[in-house]
Amino acid sequence: MPPLNNMTTVIFPGSFDPFTIGHYDIVMRGLALFDQVIIGIGNNSSKQSTFPLEERLQAIQEAFAHEPRVKVEVYQGLTIDFAIEHHAQCILRGVRSVQDFEYERNIAEANKQLCGIET
């Protein structure tokens, strides 16, 4: 289902354990390209976290308290389902290395083929 308005939305998924300056920079770059950035904190109960989920959520919300175009949510399940739920046109990702790029490229191709969402 398309968005109800002409607003462009991107999701930025991750565990954000911890949320770093690099993550903050990616969100700010996303705001230059999209009307809204939804940060999705993935809740993977099988992974051991350094910081509790509630603490990560609160820290990220505080970091963007000045920016009404950023929303922060916790989600479970597939990232692509989270993107579809929010009518996102794109998934925002950061790449740190060649290995990251290869992994992200494969995921991006699957997202595009299965759901038509760019990464």
Model-derived segments and their meaning:
Residues 2-119:
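Nucleotidyltransferase catalytic core that binds NTPs
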